[in-house]
Curated annotation (Swiss-Prot):
Belongs to the GcvP family. PANTHER family: GLYCINE DEHYDROGENASE (DECARBOXYLATING), MITOCHONDRIAL, GLYCINE DEHYDROGENASE, DECARBOXYLATING. It comes from Burkholderia mallei (strain ATCC 23344). GO terms for cellular component: cytosol; glycine cleavage complex. One of its GO terms (biological process) is glycine decarboxylation via glycine cleavage system. GO terms for molecular function: glycine binding; glycine dehydrogenase (decarboxylating) activity; pyridoxal phosphate binding. The modification N6-(pyridoxal phosphate)lysine is found at residue 723. The glycine cleavage system is composed of four proteins: P, T, L and H. This is Glycine dehydrogenase (decarboxylating). The gene is gcvP.
Length: 975
């Protein structure tokens, strides 16, 4: 049956109420092509129906027999209904004033940043800035972040964010293992480090043979450790002078990592000035809501000598083709997509959007504003200390920035009860102690409430705050020897945009430089740049989700946990597995967790020797990097001429490693963009040799509702909620990477002993700092699934496959499609082979990518999985009109290449070799090129009405790496 156009439905009378209700309205807005467009594309492909196309694309042996079993979410909800249902869950959360601390603090998000960054699709729909010429705005914002972190830590260079403080500390541990003394495998963690950080470090250390020791900081120098982690200030609030200790650790051949509070560093001596080699921490309190644990941007800063060992993205300054300053991602050869198992880390997605928010918080407040906030926080803490001492309590710590640990003896339970009555959370620091951490939002009235609570428990009257304030010496809580004297945030960007008008215009000027989904499609293969609907995004900023502390009592987080449980069951239904954990806060972390689960399973069976991981040659670089981190040995399996796993080679490798085979990691559909026909056989071969099957969920957008890894032989998968389930990419994060497992692996899912979170009773430990990872963005995926329902989720998958095949069919006469399945069909993406073009014209895949910018498009994925190719993934959200615009651009570029091939255009002086063309170049007095200005800037007529101008010419990558500079540049450089 052919799809019916809605106009024909409207011509029928009478229409019932059921026909007029708009439960499917969201799906019609999420899926780009309407019924008529879909039919036109199907006609182009030679299929009468979408179902017929899907039958031809997906092997019958792996098709789902049943509709997605979504239970109460099987039927779609309208946007209003879904928001109301989620609001009902949010209202079950109780927003208390949380003074728990432990790395998480309430904060004020400046409204100008909330509206113009967090809620602005120009920022949140962008991709990781691998194409620097169309990413200058967010690259500048991330460079500001790096400058901010380097200044505040007193170290030479910072990266552009990591996932959370705990994983940043674990990354620092492995960094120091690579550069540290080879005779030691000990990493020493001071006993006042945040407990969640210690847990993640232990999880990360075990598979790679690092021994973690924990004890008093004073004993660190004698531990013969290659690295030592110190907390500054400590978890109990102490501000300690570690200068002599750092010297002793260095004298013993070790290195020092400091986990430092970013706000405290505005008033405390920075770690880089007293001996730290690496500093890590969380920037959450710079304007990013707690969000039940995330997402937040962690940071890492290092001494210059370690810059090439840093994990994650690093923004650097270079020049463009005209010699003007330009920004780009630097030192990319460190990263997993290039170095695979030899990479510094498996981190791919980081926390770009949150790093941008934190950097803009610093830009908006400036150094004076930040210091004022810090001094106010410290003053409130000092007044609280004075008040409770006046009431007869003793503080465990005499020095502090914002945190007090108080001896409360037998009054402890009563104190917590009085606090709960005032809707206040205090930290439970044992049976006889209470912790209090104040923050930017703490007011005089809040201080009065806190003093009243302690007074009630003491049977006394709370002291007068003004009297306390008048009698308190200036800054008595900070050791004078550790007060900061060095300047920070001296660059003009942190000293100019302090009025809202200036800030608004600065943010607009940056976003205007970038190309995101709000301008055009982003056809990046394996990245799934689909719609991030506004209704999905709205709940992220609700205080009932944003102002919840991750360690709040369970009775205050009922709504959160119900929503999370529901989302886990939705994902169980989509994957065909038995259980899901949402703790991993990136795809790389979910992948890593999955491999640890496999190892734990083998260990439980007395087969801990199984450590070989088979990985196809076509796999994404994250796979071997994760396997290496999980302590596995990577053995590469060849692919055949069609891009499929070579079954003969797989059998040979499985036979050779039968005794020690742990797992195979496969991506499905494959990274070559096809549904391999023999995926069941692959799984059976590995299972026959005692291994487990890890199915990478990067391409889940081609499977939802049609097939499921848990049903065709997979044992474990990670998903990318920032791909398939609509969490935006944010310019390089946030993301969520749930790990889904079969029933035999469920008990090994991540847990967190310090908070009592036990998803699996024999869990692998914590892989993220918070029990539920990046919990505050989970409502996005919940909303998407609730509004789509089972039928429309399947329709979205089918449309993604339709769109990809339409592009492949239309472009095949111009660019060979490198891999396809039976009937010449692809899955949800296709690979265009540009290698013959380079041979015939000298034009490279890079030239084509840059030329697409002149046409107003982000390039497809370049040279992955095959060098010299473009991988195109349109997703289901793009309309036929937008697909046709992209197709027209690619055909026009092919005509420009043909002109070079035929000698009608010079091999060096042509629009592709000089792309992209900036407005300054096109309007300059001199035009030295053989082609016209019009061809350079307006190669197709549609650009006249809507032209995006790249702000810089082609970035010089080699120059940037040779002359590495990763801080803000002087204004004069832009003159």
């Amino acid at each position: 049956m052919k799809l019916e156009h809605p106009d024909r439905l409207m011509n029928r009378t009478p229409l019932s109420l059921a026909a007029l209700e708009t439960h499917d309205a969201f799906a019609e807005r999420h899926i780009g092509p309407d019924a008529a467009s879909q039919q036109a594309m199907l006609d182009t492909l030679g299929f009468a129906t979408r179902a017929a196309l899907i039958d031809a694309v997906i092997p019958a042996s792996i098709r789902r027999a049943e509709t997605l079993p979504l239970g109460p979410f099987a039927q779609p909800k309208s946007e209003a209904e879904a928001l109301a249902a989620l609001r009902a869950l949010a209202d079950k959360n109780q927003v208390f004033r949380s003074y728990i601390g432990q790395g998480y603090y309430d904060t004020h998000t400046p409204a100008v940043i909330l509206r113009n960054v967090l809620e602005n699709p120009a920022w949140y729909t962008a991709y990781t800035p691998y194409q620097p010429e169309i990413s200058q705005g967010r690259l500048e914002a991330l460079l500001n972040f790096q400058q901010m972190v380097a200044d505040l830590t007193g170290l030479e260079i910072s990266n552009a964010s990591l996932l959370d403080e705990a994983t940043a500390a674990a990354e620092a541990m492995t960094l120091l293992q690579r550069v540290g003394k080879p005779q030691s495998n000990v990493f020493y963690v001071a006993d006042d480090v945040l407990p969640q950080t210690l847990e993640v470090i232990k999880t990360r250390a075990k598979p790679i043979g690092i021994e973690v020791k924990s004890g008093p900081a004073a004993d660190a120098a004698a531990a013969n450790a290659f690295g030592v982690l110190l907390q500054y200030p400590g978890a109990n609030g102490d501000v300690r002078d570690y200068r002599a200790l750092a010297d002793a650790i260095h004298a013993a051949g070790g290195h020092v990592v400091v986990a430092a509070d970013i706000l405290a560093l505005t008033v405390l001596m920075p770690p880089g000035e007293w001996g730290a080699d690496v500093a890590v921490g969380n920037t959450q309190r710079f304007g990013v809501p707690m969000g039940f644990g995330g997402p937040h941007a962690a940071y890492m800063a290092v001494r210059d000598e370690f810059k090439r060992q840093m994990p994650g993205r690093l923004v650097g300054v270079t020049v463009d083709a005209q010699g003007k300053p330009a920004l780009r991602l630097a030192l990319q050869t460190r990263e997993q997509h290039i170095r695979r198992e030899k990479a510094t880390s498996n981190v791919c997605t980081a926390q770009a959007l949150l790093a941008i928010m934190a950097s803009m918080y610093a830009v908006y407040h400036g150094p004076r504003g930040l210091k004022t906030i810090a001094l106010r926080v410290n003053r409130i803490a000092a007044l609280l200390a004075a008040g409770i001492r006046h009431l007869g309590y003793a503080t465990v710590n005499d020095t502090f920035f914002d945190t007090l640990t108080i001896d409360t003896g037998a009054r402890t339970a009563q104190l917590h009860a009085f606090a709960q009555a005032k809707r206040i959370n205090l930290r439970r620091a044992g049976d006889t102690r209470v912790g209090v951490s104040v923050d930017e939002t703490t007011t005089r009235a809040d201080l009065a409430d806190l003093l009243t609570i302690f007074a009630q428990a003491a049977g006394a009257t709370a002291p007068d705050i003004d009297a306390l304030d008048a009698g308190l010496l200036p800054a008595p809580a900070l050791p004078p020897s550790l007060e900061r004297t060095s300047a920070y945030l001296t660059h003009h960007v942190f000293n100019r945009h302090h009025s809202e008008t200036e800030m608004l215009r600065y943010l607009r000027s940056l976003s205007d430089k970038d190309l995101a989904l709000d301008r055009s499609m982003i056809p990046l293969g394996s990245c799934t740049m689909k719609l991030n609907a506004t209704s999905e995004m709205l709940p992220v900023t609700w205080p009932e989700f944003g102002r919840i502390h991750p360690f709040a009592p369970a009775e205050q987080t009922v709504g959160y946990r119900e929503m999370i449980d529901q989302l886990e069951q939705m994902l169980v239904a989509a994957t065909g597995y038995a259980a899901v954990s949402l703790q991993p806060n990136a795809g790389s972390q979910g992948e890593y967790a999955g491999l640890l689960i496999i190892h734990a399973y083998h260990e439980s069976r007395g087969e801990s020797h199984r450590d070989v991981c088979l990985i196809p040659a076509s796999a994404h670089g994250t796979n071997p990097a994760s396997a290496h981190m999980a302590g596995m040995k990577v053995v590469v399996v060849a692919c055949d001429a069609q891009g499929n796993v070579d079954i003969a080679d797989l059998k040979a490798k499985a036979d050779a490693h039968s005794h020690d085979l742990a797992a195979i990691m496969i991506t499905y559909p494959s990274t070559h963009g096809v549904f391999e026909q023999n995926v069941r056989e692959i799984c059976e071969i590995v299972h026959a040799h005692g291994g487990q099957v890890y199915v990478d969920g990067a391409n889940m957008n081609a499977m939802v509702g049609l097939t499921a890894p848990g049903q065709f032989g997979g044992d474990v998968s990670h998903l990318n909620l920032h791909k398939t389930f609509c969490i935006p990419h944010g310019g390089g994060g946030p993301g969520v990477g749930p790990v889904a497992v079969g029933p035999h692996l469920a008990k090994f899912l991540p847990n967190q002993r310090s908070t009592g979170y036990a998803r699996g009773e024999d869990g692998i430990g914590a892989v993220s700092a918070a029990p539920y990872g990046s919990a505050s963005i989970l409502p996005i995926s919940w909303m998407y699934i609730a509004m789509m329902g089972a039928k429309n989720l399947t329709a979205a998958t089918e449309t993604a496959i339709l769109n990809a095949n339409y592009i492949a069919k239309r472009l095949a006469p111009h660019y060979p499609v490198l891999y396809s399945g039976p009937g010449g069909l692809v899955a949800h993406e296709c690979i265009l082979d540009l290698r013959p073009i380079k041979d015939s014209s000298g034009i490279t895949v890079d030239d084509v990518a840059k030329r697409l910018m002149d046409y107003g498009f982000h390039a497809p994925t370049m040279s992955f999985p095959v060098p010299g190719t473009l991988m195109v993934e349109p997703t289901e959200s793009e309309s036929q009109e937008e697909l046709d615009r992209f197709i027209a651009a690619m055909i026009a570029i092919r005509d420009e290449i043909r002109a070079v091939e035929e000698g009608r255009a010079d091999r060096e002086d042509n629009p592709l070799r000089h792309a992209p063309h900036t407005a300054a170049v096109v309007t300059a007095n001199e035009w030295p090129h053989a082609y016209s200005r019009e061809q350079a800037a307006f190669p197709v007529a549609s650009l006249v009405a809507n032209k995006y101008w790249p702000p810089v010419g082609r970035a010089d990558n080699a120059y940037g790496d040779r002359n590495l500079f990763c801080s803000c540049v002087p204004v004069s450089d832009y003159a």
